[in-house]
Amino acid sequence: MGMIQEFKEFAVKGNAMDLAVGVIIGGAFGKIVDSIVGDLIMPLVSRVVGKLDFSNLFFVLGDNPNNLTALADLKKAGIAVFAYGSFLTILVNFIILAFIIFMMVKQMNRMRKEEPAAPAEAPATPEDVLLLREIRDSLKK
């Protein structure tokens, strides 16, 4: 069997196709979660905290001789900063995404349990039992 034929068989197997679909849907779903976090949740959190832009939250670790206040300006000047705002946004994003995936998996597991088990097929009668039945029936005659 040639390598191209093997690749075709691999590519059209269910697992490879399921993985491809999952990656595509996951990418689109990630954008939805980014929008929920960035456009809905973080503005509410920033309203409570008092900061509108979390990505601009940081601590200056080095000397700041020019008294720069913007994170981009500090980084451009080469001043050491501990930028935790972007991390907070990404952390909230991750927690929401993980919770949604958990709920989806939980629902899928519940649906699997609810499906009735297919009735087991009766196993084929062994040959020796068939032979014994045939002998018994012959003796009855």
Swiss-Prot record:
Organism for this UniProt entry: Dechloromonas aromatica (strain RCB)
Which keywords appear in this protein's UniProt record, sorted alphabetically? Cell inner membrane, Cell membrane, Ion channel, Ion transport, Membrane, Transmembrane, Transmembrane helix, Transport
- Family statement: Belongs to the MscL family.
Described by its record, this protein's role is as follows: Channel that opens in response to stretch forces in the membrane lipid bilayer. May participate in the regulation of osmotic pressure changes within the cell.
- Asked if the keyword Zinc belongs to this entry, the reply reads no
InterPro entries named in the record: MS_channel (IPR001185), MSC/AndL (IPR037673), MscL_channel (IPR036019)
- UniProt feature coiled coil, ranges: none
A Pfam family for this UniProt protein?
Answer: MscL
Task: From the Swiss-Prot or TrEMBL record, state where the protein is found.
Answer: Cell inner membrane
CC per GO annotation? plasma membrane
Q: Annotated Gene Ontology MF terms?
A: mechanosensitive monoatomic ion channel activity
Assembly and interaction partners: Homopentamer.
Answer yes or no on keyword Transport. Answer: yes
Report membrane topology.
Multi-pass membrane protein
Give the signal peptide, or none: none
Its main subcellular localisation, reduced to a broad class, is: membrane
Give TM regions: 21-41, 85-105
**Under what name is this protein listed?**
Large-conductance mechanosensitive channel
